[in-house]
Swiss-Prot record:
Domain of life: Eukaryota
Domain TCTP: 6-140
Cellular-component GO terms for this entry: cytoplasm
Family: Belongs to the TCTP family.
Protein name according to UniProt: TPT1-like protein
Organism field: Homo sapiens (Human)
Gene Ontology molecular function terms on file: calcium ion binding
Length: 140
């Protein structure tokens, strides 16, 4: 029997699961940033029929009718890892990323002090790149 190992990437600050190695990703700027490929997908949620519900269906409501279904469209890697898309303006993103970078800097000072200066320099360049291309990112 072959053992399969899946690598899961976690956020250092929030400890949220971000994505797994089942998605194509690439390191940018010596690992300062990861880009993860995702596809826009649509999924139907809901649509549970009486035959799948235990108990007395006639006492629960009209017989033979399923619950309402909803079609949800989004990026597969976001939906599969239960992440929430944001709808930042450029200004709101800039404020949020500055606060986040302060948190990252604090973690690095605790755990890898020699990494602080190169990380902060490289991250500033990457943030400039993201802000310059902000219009190209999906906003819901």
């Amino acid at each position: 029997m072959e053992t399969v190992i899946m690598i899961t990437y976690w956020d250092l600050i929030s400890h949220s699961e971000m994505f797994s190695d089942s998605y194509m990703s690439q390191e940018i700027a010596d690992g300062l940033r990861l880009e993860v490929e995702g596809k826009i997908v649509s999924r139907t949620e809901g649509n549970i029929f009486d035959s799948l519900i235990g108990g007395n269906a006639s006492a629960e409501g009209p017989e033979g009718k399923g619950t309402e279904s909803t079609v949800i469209t989004g990026v597969d890697s976001v939906m599969n890892h239960h992440l929430q898309e944001t709808s930042f303006t450029k200004e709101a993103y800039n404020k949020c990323i500055k606060d986040y970078m302060k948190s990252i800097k604090g973690k690095l000072e605790e755990q890898r002090p020699k990494r602080v200066k190169p990380f902060m320099t490289g991250a500033a360049e990457q943030i400039k790149h993201i802000l310059a291309n902000f219009k190209n990112y999906q906003k819901t």
